[in-house]
UniProtKB/Swiss-Prot annotation:
<feature type="transmembrane region" description="Helical">
    <location>
        <begin position="175"/>
        <end position="195"/>
    </location>
</feature>
<keyword id="KW-0812">Transmembrane</keyword>
<comment type="function">
    <text>Catalyzes the transfer of the diacylglyceryl group from phosphatidylglycerol to the sulfhydryl group of the N-terminal cysteine of a prolipoprotein, the first step in the formation of mature lipoproteins.</text>
</comment>
<feature type="binding site">
    <location>
        <position position="139"/>
    </location>
    <ligand>
        <name>a 1,2-diacyl-sn-glycero-3-phospho-(1'-sn-glycerol)</name>
    </ligand>
</feature>
<keyword id="KW-0808">Transferase</keyword>
<dbReference type="Pfam" id="PF01790">
    <property type="entry name" value="LGT"/>
</dbReference>
<feature type="transmembrane region" description="Helical">
    <location>
        <begin position="56"/>
        <end position="76"/>
    </location>
</feature>
<keyword id="KW-1003">Cell membrane</keyword>
<comment type="similarity">
    <text>Belongs to the Lgt family.</text>
</comment>
<feature type="transmembrane region" description="Helical">
    <location>
        <begin position="10"/>
        <end position="30"/>
    </location>
</feature>
<feature type="transmembrane region" description="Helical">
    <location>
        <begin position="202"/>
        <end position="222"/>
    </location>
</feature>
<feature type="transmembrane region" description="Helical">
    <location>
        <begin position="237"/>
        <end position="257"/>
    </location>
</feature>
<dbReference type="GO" id="GO:0042158">
    <property type="term" value="P:lipoprotein biosynthetic process"/>
</dbReference>
<keyword id="KW-0472">Membrane</keyword>
<protein>
    <recommendedName>
        <fullName>Phosphatidylglycerol--prolipoprotein diacylglyceryl transferase</fullName>
        <ecNumber>2.5.1.145</ecNumber>
    </recommendedName>
</protein>
<dbReference type="GO" id="GO:0005886">
    <property type="term" value="C:plasma membrane"/>
</dbReference>
<keyword id="KW-1133">Transmembrane helix</keyword>
Amino acid sequence: MLPYPQIDPVAVAIGPLQIHWYGLMYLVGIGGAWLLASRRLNKFDPTWTKEKLSDLIFWLAMGVIVGGRLGYVLFYDLSAYIANPLLIFEVWKGGMAFHGGFVGVMIAAWWFGKRNGKSFFQLMDFVAPLVPIGLGAGRIGNFINAELWGKPTDVPWAMVFPPFSDPAQLARHPSQLYQFALEGVALFIILNLYARKPRPTMAVSGMFALFYGIFRFVVEFVRVPDAQLGYLAWGWVTMGQILSLPMIIAGLLLIWLAYKRDPSASKAAA
């Protein structure tokens, strides 16, 4: 069993002002995405300026935050927010959903592309390899917060999370680190290696949807579901799996359509 590192979730406290590591991880994700995007900008569109890129990253970040919050409200704890709607604005108490954030990013990409002469999938193909930076940073934030841990296990790398998070004090899968490794590191490598060569429009977006969906679906088997939801079917199906399955299907469909529309790309890949 590995010891859980006792890291104060509050990175900096100045009087009543507290800056949490989880919030800083969002800044790391946004900053990292901007740096990588700036390196790939000339390949994407030589006419784009760094200012236009900054505008894109800003609106994508807004999509993540607003979409992530609304996604959590709608899919994970709707009854609580209906009973007390003001809770929606208490984002410092947690409650963000990737799938909602993903929808927010898609809406932001569509809106920004429409105003800047880019199609939806042109922008999504550019943005997709950036997303794992934010995903990985977010999972580190979850780990520091000692939240979203996994099921009890006796594997050698199991961890006992702090009593405030897990009163049962059981050795558990550090599922946040699994998601960091898969959704952050592995997905980053897959997408950025794949995107090095010219690909047909929609293919990179499809790869993101496919592999994120697979990774999330798999990790859900060892992650404890949200207490207010539990398992939704057959004693093992979680909300995360229900929301990830359409991503897997959509990813396969996008890749198939991309290469069907551009047979020369399929031959080049072979």
